[in-house]
Design a protein with these regions (language model features):
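Alpha-helical recognition segments enriched in aromatics with Gly/Pro capping
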Residues: 201-204, 277-280, 284-297, 306, ...
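Non-catalytic terminal extensions that flank enzyme cores
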Residues: 1-41, 58, 64, 282, ...
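Acidic, turn-prone loop/beta-hairpin segments
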Residues: 71, 187-188, 684-715, 728, ...
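Amphipathic alpha-helical
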Residues: 2, 6-7, 159-160, 164-186, ...
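N-terminal catalytic cores of NTP/NDP-binding nucleotidyl/phosphoryl-transfer enzymes
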Residues: 18-81, 142, 151, 211-214, ...
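Protease-associated
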Residues: 216-301
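C-terminal low-complexity, glycine/proline- and small-hydrophobic-enriched intrinsically disordered tails
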Residues: 661, 790-948
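Residue patterns forming the tRNA-binding/recognition surfaces of aminoacyl-tRNA synthetases
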Residues: 4-5, 9-13, 82-220, 275-277, ...
C-alpha cells in the first residue's frame, strides 16, 4: 500500500527527528491525548492541523519539532477499569462495539495501567497511519518515573513561591471515588461551572424553609415560596436550626455543611398554603405548589420574585388560572393578593421588567421554550445596568451588582442566610458512573489562581501571545480573571504524589501545564536514572541555577540545557476550545510563575468541535467513526484532505460521507492529472529538469500568473492556520484554473506543444509541493514517480514568482471570456444563425479617458471631463461627456489595470473564440466597416459587437 510504503521510508530515514542546528526553529505542540478509548475522526482533525502546519514550515526551511506524548494520569482509567471489573453492561458494550476492543482483551482492561498501555499503543499506530510527522523519540507517558520527577520539580517550584497552599474550598467531587474530579474525570458535565448560591432562611413555626438563589438582592420583592409537591422533603438539623430541604439537596449539602442530620421526612403538602416570614422584610408570604422546582438543584426550595424573574412571573400567572390547584390547597383568599413587587429598574423596561419581556417575546406559559431566553436576557442586563429602586431602605439607587454582594453579606452577618455551592447545570457524572456533588474540602491543596499578582503576570503572558482566532483572547482574559483557587490534588488515580504530602496525588490538569518544555529534553531523560533527576537538575536545565546537588554529569547537563534553550519558548500551542477555561489558561499561569519572560509561549490556536452528519460526536453515545476505520475506507490522505478542507480549525466541522466521497474523487483527479501531463508530453516527466520555454500566448502566461497567485494566497493562509482557505486556493480554485487552461489549449494537447508541456509540468511540480502538507503520501508517490529528488516532505515550499503575476494578463483572459459570453448572449437574443461576428475595439482616446478617471479615483464626471478636455484627448467634447458618464458608471464595477493590447489578445485566442461562438469572428480597430454604427459603443475591456 502506498501510504504504508512512505511511512516506512520516512521512519527509516528518521526524516522527522529534529535536533538543534543553525536553522530557525519552529516548536509546535497539540494537547496530548488521554488514551482511554479509540481515536475517532474528531481526534483526526485535532492532530492533523498541527501536522499540516509542521510539514508546511519544514518545507519553508524551518527546523520543526512536532512531538507527541500520552496523558494518562488521573482517575478516569480507574473508573473505567472498575466498571469493566463489575461487568457493567454499558461499559462492556462501549469498549467492545464502539472502541472495538477484541473480546479476549476486554478482561485485561480491568487493570487501569493496561488500559493506558493498550490505547496509547493504538493511538501511536493510528497516528503513524495518518502520516503524522512526529519526532517519536520524545514520546512519553505521564506516569513515567522520569516525568514524575519533572512534575515534582514543577509543583515544588510553585509551592516555594507560595502559589500552592492548603485550604478550604468547594470542589467537584465524586463520593463513590472519594476524590475531587476535573473535566477529564467526567462522563458527563465537562465544562460545567460551580455556582455560589445564597441560602435565605424563611421562618415557618419552629422550622426554616431554606431557599437557594443566585440573586439575594431580590428578596425584597419575594411574594411567595415555591415547593414541589411531588418530591421528597426532609427536616434536617443544622446547628440549632431545623431546615426544610429536599432529600436530594441533603445529599449535596452534607458534603458542605458538617453534622447536617436528617430528623424526619416532611410532606410538602402540609406546608403549601401556610405562611412563612421573609427574613429581610419581616413580611409573611404564602407557600405555593410548583412542579418546576428541581429537587436536585440548590435546596429544592425557591422563593418567588415575579417582578424580575420571568419564570416566577409566568408560574404565578399560570397558578392563578389553575382552579384545581387553588381549590386543592385552599388558596382562594391568598392568591388574589399576590402581585409582583418592584425591585430593580433598568432602562428600556417598566416597573415590572419580567412582564415586559414576557409580552415582547410572546411567552404564553411555563412550557414556552423562549422562557429560558427571557430569563438570561433580563438577568444579564439587570446585573450589568440595573439599579435598586429608591424606595428600598439602605440599598435604593445602588447598582444591582454591588447591592447583591452588600445585601448578601448583611443577611449572612445577621444569620438570615448562609452560602452553598451547586453545579450550574446537571448531570455531572464521574467516569465511575456516579453522580458528582460539590464538596467543601478542608484538607486540600490548591493552586492559588486567585492571587492578584499572579493573575496580572498571566495577563502579560496572554498579551504577548498571538491568539487564533483573535476573538478568543477575550475568553482568556475572562477566565484569567474568573479563575479561583483550584484543587490540585487527588487521593485516587494514576500520577505523581505531592513531594511534601504524599497521601495526595497531583491532579491531571496541574501535571499538564508545562510539559511542552519536557518534550524538548525527553529524548535524553528516557534512559536516565530517575533518582538523578532531582530539583537541582531541573533548576539548572530550565532556569540556569547552579547547585552542588546536581547528580548528572556537567557535560550531559549542558547538552540537555542547550537543547531546551534551542527549542524554547513554545511557538504554537494547539487545543480544542473546551480547555480555554482550564488547561490553556493554567499553561499561561504556570509559565508566568516558573519561566523567565523569554521562555513564555508565543501563540495559541483554539479548535472548534466535530460533528457527524450534523450531530455532535460522542464516544460514550456511540456517535463516532473511528479514525482507523476512516483510513481503511478512504485512505489517510482523503481523511486528511477532508478534515482540512471542510472548515477552518476554529470552526466546527461536519463529517458527511457524501462530501468525503467527493474529496476522494478530487484526490483521484489530482493523481490522474499527473499522468495526463506525462501523456501530453509523450515521454517520461522529470520535474527536476523542466525545459523552460519562452511564453508568448496570453493563456500560457495567464496560467502561470494564476498558479503563482494561488501559491501566494495559500502560503499566506497557512501562515495563520487557515487550512480551508489554503486548500480553496491550492486545490479547488487551482483545479478550476487548470481545467480552464486545458480546455483553452485543448486543440494543442495532441501536438506536443512546448509551451503547453512547460506550463503543465511547472504547474504539476508546484502543485505536488503545495499539497504535500495535506496529502503527504500521495505527493511523495507522485514526486517519486515523476522525477522529484529526495522526499517532497522536505522539498522547498513553492516560492511566489511575482514577475509572472500580472493583473494585465488576468484582465486579458477575462476579456476573452467576457467577449465569448457577450457574443453568445446577443446571438441568443437575435435568435438567428450568425454567419459572422464583428468585434470593435475601443480607440486610444477612450483608454486615455479611462486612465484619467482612474487617476481621479472616483466617478466625478466634472473632474474627469475637465482633465480630459485639458489634455486634449479628443476633439468632440460632447462625445467625451457621453463616454465620461459611461466610464464613471463602469469604474465602480471594472478594475482598471492599464491599457491592454486587445487586438493582439483576441487575435491570439481567435480560433478558440470562433469555436466557442460557432461563428467567424472579425476584429476591427476602427469604424471603416460599421453598417450599424456599433463601433461607437466600444469601451476599454468591453468591445462592441455586431452580428451578421
Amino acid at each position: 500500500m502506498t501510504e504504508k510504503k512512505w511511512q516506512k521510508k520516512w521512519a527509516d530515514e528518521k526524516l522527522f527527528e529534529s535536533n538543534p542546528n543553525d536553522k530557525e526553529k519552529l516548536f509546535i505542540t497539540v494537547a496530548f491525548p488521554y488514551p482511554s478509548g479509540a481515536m475517532h475522526i474528531g481526534h483526526g482533525r485535532t492532530y492533523t492541523v498541527p501536522d499540516v502546519y509542521a510539514r508546511f514550515k519544514r518545507m519553508e526551511g524551518y527546523n520543526v519539532l512536532f512531538p507527541m506524548a500520552w496523558h494518562v494520569t488521573g482517575a478516569p482509567v480507574i473508573g473505567i477499569a472498575d466498571r469493566i471489573k463489575r461487568k457493567d453492561p454499558w461499559t462492556l458494550n462501549l469498549y467492545e462495539n464502539v472502541h472495538r476492543v477484541p473480546k479476549d482483551e476486554l478482561p485485561k482492561l480491568e487493570d487501569p495501567e493496561y488500559i493506558v498501555r493498550y490505547f496509547s499503543s493504538e493511538y501511536n499506530e493510528v497516528m503513524h497511519d495518518m502520516g503524522y510527522s512526529i519526532d517519536w523519540r520524545r514520546e512519553f507517558r505521564t506516569i513515567d518515573p522520569t516525568y514524575k520527577k519533572f512534575i515534582e520539580w514543577q509543583i515544588t517550584t510553585l509551592y516555594e513561591k507560595g502559589l500552592v497552599q492548603r485550604g478550604e474550598h468547594p470542589v467537584k467531587y465524586c463520593p463513590n471515588c472519594d476524590n475531587p474530579v476535573g473535566d477529564h474525570d467526567l462522563l458527563e458535565g465537562e465544562g460545567v461551572g460551580v455556582n455560589e448560591l445564597t441560602l435565605l432562611k424563611f421562618q415557618i413555626d419552629d422550622k426554616i424553609l431554606v431557599t437557594a438563589t443566585l440573586r439575594p438582592e431580590t428578596i425584597v420583592g419575594a411574594t411567595n415560596i415555591w415547593l414541589n409537591p411531588d418530591v421528597e422533603y426532609v427536616l434536617v438539623k443544622a446547628n440549632d436550626e431545623k431546615w426544610v430541604i429536599t432529600k436530594e439537596a441533603h445529599y449535596n449539602l452534607e458534603q458542605q455543611i458538617k453534622d447536617l442530620d436528617i430528623i424526619s421526612e416532611i410532606n410538602p403538602n402540609d406546608l403549601i398554603g401556610k405562611m412563612a416570614i421573609n427574613p429581610f422584610t419581616g413580611n409573611e408570604i404564602p407557600i405555593f405548589p410548583a412542579s418546576f422546582v428541581s429537587a436536585s438543584y440548590g435546596s429544592g426550595v425557591v422563593f418567588s420574585e415575579p417582578a424580575d424573574a420571568p419564570a416566577d412571573y409566568i408560574a404565578l400567572k399560570d397558578l392563578k388560572k389553575n382552579e384545581e390547584l387553588i381549590s386543592k390547597y385552599n388558596l382562594e383568599e391568598i392568591i388574589e393578593n399576590v402581585v409582583p413587587i418592584p425591585v430593580c429598574t433598568v432602562k428600556g423596561y417598566g416597573e415590572i421588567p419580567a412582564a415586559d419581556i414576557i409580552e415582547r417575546l410572546g411567552i404564553t406559559d411555563q412550557n414556552d421554550e423562549k422562557l429560558h431566553e427571557a430569563t438570561n436576557e433580563l438577568y444579564k442586563i439587570q446585573h450589568s445596568k440595573g439599579t435598586i429602586i429608591d424606595s428600598i431602605p439602605g440599598f435604593g439607587g445602588k447598582k444591582v451588582r454591588f447591592a447583591r454582594e452588600e445585601l448578601k453579606e448583611e443577611l449572612i452577618s445577621k444569620n438570615m442566610a448562609t452560602i452553598m455551592y451547586d453545579f450550574a447545570e446537571r448531570p455531572v457524572v464521574c467516569r465511575c458512573g456516579n453522580n458528582c456533588v460539590v464538596k467543601i474540602m478542608d484538607d486540600q491543596w490548591f493552586m492559588k489562581y486567585s492571587n492578584p499578582e499572579w493573575k496580572e503576570k498571566t495577563h502579560e503572558v496572554l498579551n504577548r501571545e498571538t491568539i487564533i482566532p483573535p476573538e478568543i483572547k477575550n475568553n482568556f482574559n475572562y477566565y484569567i480573571d474568573w479563575l479561583d483557587d483550584w484543587a490540585c490534588s487527588r487521593k485516587v488515580g494514576l500520577g505523581t504524589r505531592l513531594p511534601w504530602d504524599n497521601k495526595w496525588l497531583i491532579e491531571p490538569l496541574t501535571d499538564s501545564t508545562i510539559y511542552m518544555s519536557y518534550y524538548s529534553i525527553a529524548r535524553f531523560l528516557k534512559d536516565m536514572n530517575p533518582d538523578d533527576l532531582n530539583p537541582a537538575f531541573f533548576d539548572k536545565v530550565y532556569l540556569n541555577k547552579d547547585s552542588d546537588d546536581i547528580k548528572v554529569a556537567p557535560e550531559i547537563v549542558e547538552e540537555i540545557q542547550n537543547e531546551f534553550n534551542y527549542w524554547y519558548p513554545l511557538d504554537w500551542r494547539l487545543s480544542a476550545k473546551d480547555p480555554v477555561g482550564n488547561h490553556l489558561s493554567f499553561l499561561m499561569f504556570h509559565h508566568s510563575a516558573i519561566f523567565p519572560e523569554d521562555k513564555w509561549p508565543k501563540g495559541t490556536v483554539v479548535f472548534g468541535m466535530g460533528l457527524l452528519e450534523g450531530n455532535k460526536m460522542s464516544s460514550s453515545k456511540g456517535n463516532v467513526i473511528l479514525l482507523k476505520d476512516a483510513i481503511e475506507d478512504y485512505t489517510a490522505d482523503v481523511v486528511r484532505l477532508f478534515l482540512m478542507a471542510s472548515a477552518e480549525p476554529w470552526q466546527d466541522f461536519d463529517w458527511r460521507e457524501k462530501e468525503v466521497l467527493g474529496t476522494k474523487r478530487r484526490l483521484e483527479w489530482f493523481r490522474e492529472f499527473a499522468g495526463k501531463v506525462e501523456e501530453i508530453k509523450g515521454s517520461a516527466l522529470d520535474l527536476t529538469n523542466i525545459e523552460k520555454v519562452e511564453l508568448t500566448r496570453t493563456i500560457d502566461l495567464w496560467m502561470l500568473s494564476q498558479l503563482n497567485q494561488h501559491i501566494k494566497a495559500s502560503t499566506e493562509a497557512l501562515e495563520v492556520f487557515q487550512t480551508r482557505k489554503a486548500l480553496q486556493e491550492s486545490l479547488f480554485l487551482l483545479k478550476k484554473d487548470i481545467d480552464h487552461y486545458i480546455y483553452r489549449v485543448n486543440h494543442l494537447l495532441d501536438k506536443k506543444d512546448p509551451a503547453v508541456i512547460y506550463v503543465l509540468s511547472t504547474v504539476l511540480e508546484s502543485w505536488i509541493r503545495l499539497l504535500a502538507p495535506f496529502t503527504p503520501h500521495t505527493c511523495e508517490e507522485l514526486w517519486s514517480n515523476y522525477g522529484g529528488k529526495g522526499f517532497v516532505s522536505v522539498a522547498k515550499w513553492p516560492e511566489v514568482d511575482e514577475s509572472v503575476i500580472s493583473s494585465e494578463i488576468e484582465k486579458s483572459e477575462e476579456l476573452v471570456q467576457n467577449l465569448i459570453k457577450d457574443i453568445n448572449q446577443i446571438k441568443n437574443m437575435v435568435g438567428e444563425d450568425a454567419q459572422k461576428v464583428h468585434v470593435y475595439l475601443a480607440p486610444d482616446w477612450k483608454w486615455d479617458l479611462y486612465k484619467i478617471a482612474n487617476d481621479v479615483g472616483k466617478p466625478d464626471i466634472g473632474q474627469i471631463m475637465g482633465r480630459a478636455i485639458g489634455a486634449n484627448i479628443y476633439d468632440d467634447k460632447k462625445e467625451i461627456a457621453a463616454v465620461a458618464k459611461k466610464v464613471g458608471r463602469e469604474m465602480t464595477k471594472t478594475k482598471y489595470v492599464g491599457k491592454i493590447n486587445e487586438a493582439q489578445i483576441i487575435d491570439d485566442a481567435l480560433e478558440y473564440i470562433s469555436n466557442e461562438v460557432s461563428s467567424e469572428v472579425v476584429v476591427h480597430t476602427d469604424d471603416s466597416y460599421d453598417p450599424q454604427n456599433k463601433a461607437r459603443n466600444a469601451m476599454p475591456y468591453k468591445p462592441a459587437i455586431l452580428i451578421e
